[in-house]
């Protein structure tokens, strides 16, 4: 047994200059796992609670000392002597200790940091990489794949101080032979886009996730400049590279309408879905995330009906990595893919359950970072260890994003042909 002999929590900083929670789990054999909780900007209302102190005299109320105290107090006491390899048992102990539906007593940030740190420590004690341990926990030992990256090269919405309403415009290097080549393609397009924006006299400042954040005349113009950048980088749009959007539509849903303030347009629910479909008819958009508000289930049914057979429709705020909500979506034929964010649900065990449920229902699962990140690269191992097939971890800029890409490079080097890169086949509706 990999017995836990100590659990330590601390307050560290995330990529936006806000505090977050880091945890260490120490085992009897001298193994130490360490992990940090990320934090989102555009958040679903049903996400597990990120516990903040609310003390305006520290970090504008965003301190996490209470969450840290929970780790160093009741969580540590409950986990001492337990087997770190028994992930489901550890997570259930913390869930029961919290006793609330959304982890608002101990904080999902506290529980998640310990959950991931325990997994890392257990992997070390077994002498195997984290991705291999995750595959075993997932019930799929030895089954791996390298994910297709969704690279967020233009930021808007809550991730940038510009007039672009849609939050993320992403490129997917689906024509690459392997992950290393995909990463190179994305980097070259990113640098090409910088030159295109500069030539138009547009800003090349970056947003929270490392993508450029220029002011543009419309959301369609963002797609147009990306098309130019892809072509000037020497690639063919629609063959080598496809496009993906994260609308984060909940952020501009007001009084039953979708208000694109940046371009002065207001749509009803079906009208906004039709607008997105028109963009997908003009450009090779193969994935759209949160194309409607999290509560607009009737609208989601329409969007799935008109686009779900050809385009991957990803539920982020819609499903919040929650199996109960995902079950409802599957039963009602809502969307066809789920975004997976550890901290929306608050433990590794519950995260793996959501991925398995999605796959069993024929949905895809897209592993994702948050806009507030750290150097922690666990999501890279999660993507490979569950053979999820797709990952969102920002642009080729900002060390908090690049850390995940670099970890994926290391993993691909280790696994070689055991972790194939399947490109377009990984995306719902494209196989």
UniProtKB/Swiss-Prot annotation:
The record's principal subcellular location, in a coarse class, is cytoplasm
Looking up CDD domains in the UniProt record yields: enolase
* Single Gene Ontology BP annotation: glycolytic process
- Return the cofactor note field: Binds a second Mg(2+) ion via substrate during catalysis.
Q: Where is the active site?
A: 209, 341
Name the job this protein performs: Catalyzes the reversible conversion of 2-phosphoglycerate (2-PG) into phosphoenolpyruvate (PEP). It is essential for the degradation of carbohydrates via glycolysis.
Q: How does it assemble?
A: Component of the RNA degradosome, a multiprotein complex involved in RNA processing and mRNA degradation.
User: What name appears for this protein in its UniProt entry?
Assistant: Enolase
What species is this protein from? Shewanella denitrificans (strain OS217 / ATCC BAA-1090 / DSM 15013)
């Amino acid at each position: 047994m990999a017995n836990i002999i100590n659990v330590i929590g601390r307050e560290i900083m995330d990529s936006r200059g806000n505090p977050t929670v880091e945890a260490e789990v120490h085992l009897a054999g001298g193994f130490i796992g360490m992990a940090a909780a990320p934090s989102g900007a555009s958040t679903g209302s049903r996400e597990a609670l990120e516990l903040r102190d609310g003390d305006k005299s520290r970090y504008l109320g965003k301190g996490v000392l209470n969450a840290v105290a929970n780790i160093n107090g009741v969580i540590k006491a409950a986990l001492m002597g337990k087997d770190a390899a028994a992930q489901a048992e550890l997570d259930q102990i913390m869930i029961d200790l919290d006793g609330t539906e959304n982890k608002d007593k101990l904080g999902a940030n506290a529980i998640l940091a310990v959950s991931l740190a325990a997994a890392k420590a257990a992997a070390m004690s077994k002498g195997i990489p984290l991705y291999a341990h995750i595959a075993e926990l997932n019930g799929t030992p030895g089954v791996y794949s390298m994910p297709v990256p969704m690279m967020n090269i233009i930021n808007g919405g809550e991730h940038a101080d510009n007039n672009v309403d849609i939050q993320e415009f992403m490129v997917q290097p689906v024509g690459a032979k392997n992950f290393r080549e995909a990463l190179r393609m994305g980097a070259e397009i990113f640098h090409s886009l910088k030159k295109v924006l500069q030539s138009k006299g547009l800003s090349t400042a970056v947003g929270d996730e490392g993508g450029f954040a220029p002011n543009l005349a419309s959301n369609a113009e963002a797609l147009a400049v990306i098309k130019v950048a892809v072509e000037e980088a020497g690639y063919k749009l629609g063959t080598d590279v496809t496009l993906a959007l994260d609308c984060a539509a909940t952020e501009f849903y007001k009084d039953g309408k979708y208000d694109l303030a940046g371009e002065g347009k207001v749509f009803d629910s079906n009208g906004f879905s039709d607008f997105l479909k028109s963009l997908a008819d003009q450009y090779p958009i193969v994935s759209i995330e949160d194309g409607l508000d999290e509560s607009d289930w009737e609208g989601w049914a329409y969007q799935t009906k008109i686009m779900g057979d050809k385009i991957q429709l990803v539920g982020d705020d819609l499903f919040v990595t929650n199996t109960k909500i995902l079950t409802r979506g599957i039963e009602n034929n809502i969307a066809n893919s789920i975004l997976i964010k550890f901290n929306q649900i608050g433990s590794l065990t519950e995260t793996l359950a959501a991925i398995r449920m999605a796959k069993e229902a024929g949905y895809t699962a897209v592993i994702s970072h948050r806009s507030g990140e750290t150097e922690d690269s666990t999501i890279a191992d999660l993507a490979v260890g569950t053979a999820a097939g797709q990952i969102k971890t920002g642009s080729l800029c900002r060390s908090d994003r690049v850390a995940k890409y670099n970890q994926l490079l290391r993993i691909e080097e280790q696994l070689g042909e055991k972790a194939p890169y399947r490109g377009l086949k990984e995306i719902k509706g494209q196989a």
